[in-house]
Amino acid sequence: MSSNVLKLGDQGVLVCADHGTVLASEADAITLIGDAWSHEAGWVAVPVATMHDDLFRLETRLLGNIAQKFTNYGIGLAIVGDIDAWLARSQALRAFVHESNRGRTILFVPHVSALEQKLAIGA
């Protein structure tokens, strides 16, 4: 997986490449968490384009399980990009995104600069 580490605010953020499939399973989440640790990054930013569609179907429980893994390991997960089409289809996903963005562990942002702003104000 191609990625780089940026310093956003006082946080190291592992920013995944915007091509290929980066996050499609719980095993992928563990790999990303390990990569974050090896780069001493407190956050992982994953482009929406590299995520499997099943993550946005809450009935699969995949997004919830992945979010729980990141939370358990103390690594923040930022989902970066436009998810409006998914939000239009699911009230439950809209609620999940809203509640996630109120917290400090899982964030949905339109672009990396929005993540930088959230991290600068303490998410």
Identify the meaning behind each predicted range.
Residues S2-A123:
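Amphipathic, Lys/Arg-enriched alpha-helical "gate/interface" segment within cytosolic domains
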